[in-house]
Amino acid sequence: EVDIVVRKGKHVLVEGPNGIGKSTFIDAIANNTADGVTIGEGVRVGYYSQNFSTLDYNQTAYNCLLGVMDLKDEQVLRSTAASFLLDGKALSNEIGALSEGQKGLLQFARLVLMQPGLLILDEPTNHINFRHLPVIAEALDKFEGAMLLVSHVPDFVEQVRVDEKIDMKAV
């Protein structure tokens, strides 16, 4: 049993060996099916799933990004996409046609545009080119909302502020 309160600004690392249930645990939180877990009313949850299950593969990347924006602004959408190396060609493609790396970068752009209060990240370094990791780590480190992070990449985790850890072996 886990007893933890994750408030605005708190960054929590969920750790443990492969197969212990970290992804299942945070997926249940993200989908609001975890027993004993309550997400505050009105808190927008941004979920980065390592298997891209939150993406509609038949939708264009552009429409995926546009769909999460409260204020539809073409310039903001395109500049955010560009900051994650997604150009006009990538945006016009269906998500299913993107490379795994582009799908990962699309998820990050989507989270930026979504502006969540709670960010849940399941192995966000999977499929991402190692050259892009410092930029992503810096963005996560500066994230002002609450965050739950699962990562098996110590070099990446060291670059992100972690306020508390949940050891799944102890649960």
Predicted regions span which residues?
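ABC ATP-binding cassette signature C-motif
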Residues: 1-171
